[in-house]
Regions:
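Short runs within selected transmembrane alpha-helices of multi-pass transporters and secretion channels
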Residues: 62, 131-150, 157-168, 190-206, ...
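Small-residue hotspots at the loop-to-helix junctions and early N-terminal turns
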Residues: 38-49, 124, 128, 264-279, ...
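N-terminal transmembrane alpha-helices
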Residues: 3-31, 35-36, 52-68, 93-100, ...
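Small-residue-rich hydrophobic transmembrane alpha-helices
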Residues: 41-101, 138-157, 269-333, 365-384, ...
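Helix-terminus/linker motif at the lipid-water interface of multi-pass membrane proteins
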Residues: 20, 24-42, 111-118, 174-185, ...
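Short alpha-helical transmembrane segments in multi-pass integral membrane proteins
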Residues: 1-15, 69-136, 182-239, 295-360, ...
Length: 443
């Protein structure tokens, strides 16, 4: 096996397994909550939309950390790598505290932005107030994981994630349904299970992080100063990613608000498909993570031809995997929706939505690898921001509003028209990739 394939497998496989396991257990969680009825499904789904904003913003911070750490490790400049880690960790914790305050103090007001259904808002507020405290361990765990993956210790976050989802699923069973003498807590029990599992995840990663830096003989350096780039460069990089990811996730929330106003059946149908969508994307997310590290290290060493060649190999792997998984999803869509105890019309809508998603999945995956991994590894985050803003707000959102409020289509028509904006993203990203101007060494 070549050195490239070894590095690809050491990063991609653990990340893929971690994402797949988390999405799989998310499906189990969704099915458990689904036994409580459509109101609970919808409430948890809407809470997840706000949490998506947090996850994407923290993901942006860890992406910046990964870009810089990978390039500086490739250039064998550990001091700059540690500076990147330190600044990103502080940034992540501040952001987590702000989101905790918003979700913990104003849950009903936030949920009211998505739906007018009082029962959904009241049910979701109970869940939201508890889940908000999980933002702190999620932020810290993400930044620590970025360092570990850049050092090719991706198995640590994987095992941490495996343990966390197992804890979460077990506690969900015990607390939602009141098993083994415990009280039947319903949706509140699901929230408590999520909170405990996130602290478990952080504890596992922190121990693994300490052991790995000792094994690698890395001497931690506490420094908020850079020598190869300026603070201004760092802030521009992180702010463009934050703006990009925030506006993208905000767009997802606008779309969810539109779905919410289409009625409970349409919203429930879309919500029950979300775990499967996460599973499909997660199954191939390891390639995006691996691309960021592998290509970033090549750029740090100024090996531009190798970076371009290896990028294409990762893209081909992603396309093949996405096509295979899409075929499987089309065949099994009806089996999945049949697991839910919901109205037959909701099941049928969910089945059709999954088939539409399967058709677009290869395009989504290529966009993830190109935009989220390869092109960003060069540090030029501005162009990705522009693509995200134009794709979401100039194409996606207008199409969504047009389909829902002008054409008066149901959830299937709205989702199908909206998702065509992924094609625009792919065309633009491929043009940028072939021009090679994204290949920049920060060292």
């Amino acid at each position: 096996m070549s050195k490239f394939m070894k590095s690809l497998c050491k990063i991609a496989i653990p990340v893929t397994l971690q994402s797949t396991l988390q999405a799989s257990f998310s499906i189990v969680d969704q099915i458990m909550i689904g036994q409580l009825g459509e109101t609970n499904i919808s409430a948890v789904g809407l809470c997840g939309n706000f949490s998506l904003i947090f996850s994407v913003v923290i993901g942006a911070v860890s992406t910046v950390a990964g870009i810089l750490i990978a390039q500086f490790i490739g250039a064998e400049d550990t001091k700059e790598a540690w500076s990147s880690f330190d600044v990103s960790l502080i940034s992540g914790m501040v952001i987590a505290a702000l989101f905790l305050f918003a979700a913990g103090v104003f849950p009903s007001q936030i949920l009211g932005l998505y739906t007018r259904d009082v029962s959904i808002v009241n049910t979701g507020a109970v869940y939201f107030r508890i889940v908000a405290f999980s933002y702190i361990p999620m932020a810290a765990g993400n930044i620590l994981s970025s360092w570990l993956r850049c050092r090719e210790h991706a198995t640590i976050p994987f095992w941490a994630g495996f343990g966390a989802v197992a804890v979460n699923t077990g506690l969900n069973y015990l607390l939602i349904f009141g098993k083994f003498g415990l009280p039947c807590m319903g949706i509140k029990g699901a929230a408590i299970a999520t909170l405990i599992s996130q602290f478990f995840n952080l504890a596992f990663i922190a121990v693994g992080f300490a052991l790995c830096i000792r094994k690698d003989e890395d001497k931690p350096v506490w420094s908020l100063r850079f020598s190869k780039i300026t603070i201004k460069d760092y802030l521009i990089m992180i702010m463009t990613i934050l703006v990009s990811e925030f506006l993208w996730s905000l767009g997802q929330n606008v779309e969810s608000a539109v779905y919410g106003h289409l009625g409970m059946a349409n919203l429930a149908a879309y919500t029950l498909t979300c775990p499967i969508q996460g599973l499909i994307v997660g199954a191939l997310s390891g390639l995006s993570a691996a691309a960021g590290v592998i290509v970033g290290k090549r750029l740090g060493r100024k090996e531009y031809d190798e970076a371009y060649t290896e990028s294409k190999k990762i893209m081909y792997a992603g396309l093949a995997g996405a096509v295979a998984v899409s075929i499987l999803l089309i065949l099994l869509a009806g089996v999945y929706t049949g697991l839910y105890r919901v109205d037959g019309s909701v099941k049928e809508l969910g089945k059709i939505l999954l088939m539409v998603f399967a058709l677009y999945a290869p395009v989504k995956v290529e966009n993830m690898i190109l935009g989220g991994g390869i092109i960003r590894s060069g540090g030029n985050t501005k162009i990705i921001m522009v693509i995200d803003i134009v794709g979401t707000w100039c194409i996606g959102i207008p199409l969504c509003l047009l389909a829902a409020y002008v054409f008066k289509w149901d959830i299937v028509g709205v989702y199908t028209l909206l998702t065509t904006e992924e094609i625009f993203r792919l065309v633009v990203l491929l043009v940028i990739f072939k021009r090679r101007k994204w290949m920049i060494s920060l060292s």
